[in-house]
UniProtKB/Swiss-Prot annotation:
Database matches in Pfam families: Dala_Dala_lig_C (PF07478), Dala_Dala_lig_N (PF01820)
Species assigned in the record: Streptococcus pyogenes serotype M1
Class of this enzyme: ligase
Family indicated by similarity: Belongs to the D-alanine--D-alanine ligase family.
Enzymatic reactions: 2 D-alanine + ATP = D-alanyl-D-alanine + ADP + phosphate + H(+)
UniProt gene name: ddl
Cofactor annotation remark: Binds 2 magnesium or manganese ions per subunit.
Binding site for Mg(2+) 1: D288, E301
Residues given in the record as ATP binding sites: 162-217
Protein name per Swiss-Prot or TrEMBL: D-alanine--D-alanine ligase
Enzyme nomenclature, EC number: 6.3.2.4
Binding site for Mg(2+) 2: E301, N303
GO biological process: cell wall organization; peptidoglycan biosynthetic process; regulation of cell shape
Domain of life according to the entry: Bacteria
Length: 348
């Protein structure tokens, strides 16, 4: 039986490229090599596409994907050279230029099926401010927030923010994930510095009320018919779950399934599925919630390309539902092909 080609794109231009490499290495080891041939391409910080490795069988645990230190620049290709008839692309890319609709649009121009949400839902979900406004409009609870746009009067924004919110306050670049560029502010001075830091990552900044809450996550899978997982909980050994805690210090553990009341489980799964459909989602997403001590649920964000590392919540949530990592990848490939066929049929 001939194998289907699975094209892995990893690296990328965003500050989350290191997470992308970790995710892609986990995917390449989880693939069912009886069914797939894996071809990998590294995208540099400058946006160059480099042909790297090919795997016809499971690589050893010691084998690593080629990155900046090991790539061969002689293998630089035109981005369109990744095209292969019948192949499916897994863009294991996080953050801007990865899960913001950019690469999705490129793959649609190439007429290649790809895993993940489409151009519209990727771009909306990537922007925290736009996502909050969409979810507010359909009645899904949001933590109180204000917005700062680069070039506006910063002092006026601080006055407005302190009139509406109380410390602690979290400041986030609108278009960034993996907690990159996020700060916790306890004073006006810290708030100003946090906004200035966020502006180094994006021109639009979300300023959000801090809440004492548990962090609960729900996995989503599907196209027209969406399935959700039982929720899992991120249990922190630190006050603030930032990039360092997530990916460097490993100062988190996970409880899967989360120990929450059944009514809360039902509410979260319903909100997750409704939000996914409202944003035009397809393929997959991870929906992140806050759960306060008094039982208030807030939907924090939808992550359209969640981490796929061996310790990432998304694959572990599905494993808890009985869907093993290799089978999850196969399901994602099937969904990608289904959406490709649907898009193509609408262009005729």
């Amino acid at each position: 039986m001939s194998k289907q080609t699975l094209v892995l794109l990893y690296g990328g231009r965003s500050a989350e490229r290191e997470v992308s490499v970790l995710s892609a290495e986990s995917v390449m080891r989880a693939v069912n090599y009886d069914k797939f041939l894996v071809k990998t391409y590294f995208i540099t910080q400058m946006g160059q596409f480099i042909k790297t490795q090919q795997f016809s069988e499971k690589p050893s645990e010691s084998e690593r994907l080629m990155t900046n230190e090991t790539i061969e620049l002689t293998q630089k290709i035109k981005p369109s050279d990744i095209y292969e008839e019948g192949a499916v692309v897994f863009p294991v890319l996080h953050g801007p230029m990865g899960e913001d609709g950019s690469i999705q649009g490129f793959l649609e121009v190439l007429r290649m099926p790809y895993i993940g949400t489409n151009v519209m839902s990727s771009s909306i979900a990537m922007d925290k401010i736009t996502t909050k406004r969409v979810l507010e409009s359909i009645g899904i609870p949001q933590v109180a927030y204000t917005v700062y746009i680069d070039g506006q009067d910063l002092e006026a924004c601080l006055v407005e923010t302190l009139a509406r919110l109380t410390f602690p306050i979290f400041v986030k670049p609108a278009n960034m994930g993996s907690s990159v560029g996020i700060s916790k502010a306890q004073t006006k001075v810290e708030l100003r510095k946090a906004i200035q830091l966020a502006l180094t990552y994006d021109s639009r900044v979300l300023i959000e009320q801090g809440v004492v809450a548990r962090e609960i996550e729900v996995g989503l899978l599907g196209n027209d018919k969406v399935k959700s997982t039982l929720p899992g909980e991120v249990i922190k050994d630190v006050d603030f779950y930032d990039y360092q805690a997530k990916y460097v210090d490993n100062k988190i553990t996970m409880a899967i399934p989360a120990d929450v009341d059944q009514s809360i489980v039902t509410e979260m799964r319903s909100y997750a599925e409704v939000a996914f459909k409202a944003l035009g989602g397809c393929g997959l997403s991870r929906c992140d919630f806050f759960l306060t001590q008094d039982g208030q649920v807030y939907l924090n964000e939808l992550n359209t390309m969640p981490g796929f590392t061996q310790w990432s919540m998304y694959p572990l949530l599905w494993e808890n539902m009985g869907l093993a990592y290799p089978d999850l990848i196969e399901e994602l490939v099937t969904l990608a092909q289904e959406m490709f066929d649907q898009r193509e049929s609408h262009l005729i």
